[in-house]
């Protein structure tokens, strides 16, 4: 291990020797946290009871399509920075190194993809629901199939969003995790249900400010306590945390290539093709506002997320040679962040409360946006076709859907507590269908000859194939054929006497195993493999990319088996601007820069009939 880390003002040992009370919230911390929740609830009450806006469905879901640029941009950033990001990404950097930053850097190519390829299609077709585009381009079955995958993802992921910050709160307060989860989820459901999209966006602005303040303060204070930036980089380099991996083996846990390509697919899917974000993008007055908002959001996202990734490096450098996980003071990496905060900031009045507010702000912003869009999708795709629609009835039903889903999130916490690696679990779950969803949208925009039958079967083929691959990968994990051992740290630099006594006691009761002549096991690790190549061994970072590739691998040849009807007139506005010159129809003359989205009522009048008939 490296040289002495005498610069550390405190060590794991001093924390271990501290009383339980020293690792708990102070009264000031509780006040800070309560103020954050109260501000969020207050915004919901304002837009629910005192705002002068019309009580229409369009107002509830899209803010009357008059939302301002900067708040929407901040809201887009906030909703991408879930509590999982705040807790698990630093843990990922701490245990596996800084390569996770490549997934963050993928936002750089994602923004122009959204601005010039995807969002123009939505605005030119006056789409208020991104899944509406699939019905226009293919058929209603394609739309319903993709909305089912959206609903499945929400059921799987929403409990995770709230459980992770509850874990952090429990770590520093000792309060039961499920009690915290119940209280905070209820607050989120309350303001989302009352205030609609305006409450979601403006609470995201408040919560985004809390997140920015917290992340910057943690990075600055952590660097200062470690001995400066040069010491952070020195320790991280010696510990292998700054060894960037450019290998092309897809079995490696995360590399430059898997980070960039999977990140590009993930951010394109989450920001540009997921209704929770598209709903806010199309709530802006025009395409020009949407471009500005996406550009601002991209810059803000990169700033906060790079800081978040680097906090993991700071934590490693701070605990270099004195790992609290190995010492048994932290049960798993996902709990390390709040422990670190208490260690370096516990003596600063209110600062632990600010950080926990940051983690909850991140989760609340993700949960509120998802609940609002989930209610809209469920109502318009599955309830509205079967009832007599009125704005009052629609708003009432959507509020009820939000309440039911909030209750499910609370109960889902009992399942999430059994997950080992939160970030790996999330990437694995979303890997089942995210690639298929992104793939079918890109098919619609880039492959004019692709028919509805090809699109539907392509989605099914991709999802079934990915499910098969992921199930077999989990079997390999259980069998020990895939094992993601973390990068090494140690306990040899712990200098405090109390901790050394514990360490000596452990060593005194440990025997050295007899040497064995057995060959090393055939296993795939995070950093290499001595097994024959198997598709089941590929890193979970590649799942989204593989899912999209499978859609195209099926759709391109099958588009010659089931071609589009030659008599069917192709609408060039349904395709990306980059492929319209391939069509045998003139390019539409559209002044898009200042073109607002039409309201649903206006579209209904133009069509002469309701689409849900």
Where are these regions (language model features)?
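Membrane-embedded helix-loop-helix hairpins and adjacent transmembrane boundary segments
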Residues: 1-613
